[in-house]
């Protein structure tokens, strides 16, 4: 996970927002995120539905690359839309 964490510098947390481990949501609630991907997101500093809901297209691609996921998968699985909806339900 250290290799993944080093890629966090390429992600704009000014847009995503900053969260801590204490604030983490169960990201596996989002379709397309399993335990291994959730751990990779946590390693990047992405802990909450709100952060995922704040992703722009560019950030989706950066996250996709950082977690070494199939190209376009974050967008195709609509993580941003799901993150927004789950954050509103909290």
Predicted regions and their residues:
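C-terminal extensions
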Residues: 1-31, 35-90
């Amino acid at each position: 996970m250290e290799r993944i964490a080093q890629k966090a510098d390429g992600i704009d947390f000014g847009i995503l927002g900053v969260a801590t481990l204490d604030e983490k949501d169960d990201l596996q609630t989002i379709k397309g995120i399993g335990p291994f991907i959730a751990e990779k997101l946590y390693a990047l500093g992405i802990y909450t539905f709100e952060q995922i809901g704040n992703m722009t297209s560019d950030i989706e691609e950066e996250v996709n690359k950082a977690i070494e996921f199939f190209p376009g998968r974050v967008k195709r699985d609509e993580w941003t839309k799901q993150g927004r909806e789950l954050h509103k339900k909290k």
